[in-house]
Design a protein with these regions (language model features):
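Active-site surface patch of divalent metal-dependent phosphodiester/phosphate bond hydrolases
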Residues: 32, 36, 48-183
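Metal-dependent phosphoester-hydrolase catalytic domains
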Residues: 1-24, 77-78, 120, 137-140, ...
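Catalytic metal-binding/acid-base residues of hydrolase active sites
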Residues: 43, 75, 222-224, 264-267
Length: 400
């Protein structure tokens, strides 16, 4: 049954298992006086026919626990996203980007980025934009790294010239077989622009009457995976540079608080040392700001009571997805607060909804780690495409 998804009776077992103890699998409660922000890469979220009725209902059951949900891998076809929003309930609204990552009419893998939000708690305000590096920034990078870029591009440029020559011969009837265009596989020495432009939207999370709301710019990003680790680091560092630069402008920014939610593809050649390197890099921003502003990536720290950081992919070996806070508002938690997360039901907390172990315990009577490698592979094939190969992660904030 690999790749066939779950049967109706299996979905019933999954629902019963989840409803018996949602907290066991990291699904947050809806708690009055708090707001839950989340990010979920829902694999190839396109047409309604791509998933069964039971799968859609499961996704909606999970997603309605979140007051603001950043969704990645939305396809050009929006019927699936609309169905998810409809199943979540009439109190939910959405905003979605146009397709990014591929030029219109050209081959490639493009996608949309979107937010679904609970209007009773979260209000969208005036700003909705993508994040990009302006032309002068790109030209300056090309100028500074011209020799390195030329050297990196040379092998591909040669293949492309040969392809064009053979294509002309094919069009002229000299060559009987149409040549195949070479894949663009170049290790760029510097960042030029985002493969998929992140989406930035302004929101308010409304608190109790007479209090000031959380005001923030939510950034939804699905950063480059690609063929080279250096490419991933370049995109991540470029996005951090943009957010930090905007945060420094303070009053010029629409809201001087930014929340990054997305699939940052932060996998690591050497997980422990690389994770420590990134954490040190991010926390180094805090002394620069003093008490005026802070940077906090809670998912880089083990949650209190856990020995290791959360994994966010279905194979349970990477933390691709992240939620990052860049803020001046004193209501947000600093990295020093991470050690005390989860002590109050409506206080600061964070987690991952571990549907992988939910599925395995419901249908195999054991967690995923207890399966043989072959059994893991076969079981993953049943839901990595039908549900997703990423799990949703979330952050709870107490409302003012």
């Amino acid at each position: 049954m690999a790749g066939q998804g779950f049967t109706r009776s299996e979905w019933n077992k999954i629902r019963e298992t989840l409803e018996s103890d949602p907290a066991r699998y990291g699904l947050p409660d809806r708690v009055y006086g708090s707001v839950v922000l989340a990010s979920f890469n829902i694999r190839k979220l396109g047409s309604t026919s791509s998933r069964t009725k039971d799968t859609w209902e499961f996704l909606a059951y999970v997603c309605r626990r979140f007051d603001l949900l950043a969704v990645q891998e939305i396809q050009d076809e929006l019927s699936g996203l609309r169905k998810l929003q409809e199943l979540m309930g009439p109190e939910f609204d959405m905003i979605v980007s146009d397709k990014t990552g591929v030029f219109p009419g050209e081959p490639g893998v493009g996608e949309r980025l979107g937010f679904i939000f609970n209007r009773s708690i979260v209000r969208r305000t005036e700003i909705a934009t993508d994040i990009s590096y302006d032309r002068s920034k790109v030209l300056n990078a090309i100028s500074r790294h011209n020799d390195e870029i030329h050297a990196a591009m040379a092998p591909y440029a040669k293949k492309l010239r040969n392809y064009i020559a053979m294509l002309e011969e094919f069009d002229a009837g000299i060559r009987s077989t149409k040549p195949k265009k070479p894949k663009f596989n170049v290790k760029m020495p510097t960042f030029l622009t985002f493969i998929r432009a992140p989406l930035c939207v302004s929101f308010e999370a409304m608190g109790h009457p007479g209090t000031n709301p959380y005001q923030f710019m939510a950034i939804n990003a699905h950063l480059y995976y690609g063929d080279y680790m250096s490419d991933r680091r370049q995109e991540f560092d470029a996005l951090m540079e943009w957010i930090i630069a905007r945060l420094r402008e303070n009053d010029k920014a629409y809201y001087p608080n930014f929340i990054l939610l997305g699939d940052l593809n932060l996998d690591f050649d050497k997980p422990e040392t690389d994770r420590a390197r990134i954490e040190k890099h991010l926390k180094a921003f805090n002394p620069q700001f003093g008490d005026d502003a802070h940077v906090n990536f809670p998912f880089l720290d083990p949650h209190p009571g856990r020995n290791e950081v959360f994994r966010t992919n279905a194979r349970l070996n990477e933390t691709f997805d992240q939620i990052g806070l860049f803020f001046r508002d004193k209501h947000f938690p600093t990295h020093l607060d991470n050690a005390n997360m989860g002590q109050d039901e409506r206080g600061f907390d964070y987690g991952v909804f571990g549907f992988v172990n939910l599925f395995s315990e419901a249908l195999n009577n054991k967690p995923m780690a207890a399966l043989t490698n072959d059994a893991k592979k076969k079981f993953l094939a049943r839901f990595e495409h039908k549900v997703s190969d990423h799990m949703p992660l979330w952050l709870r904030l107490p409302l003012p």
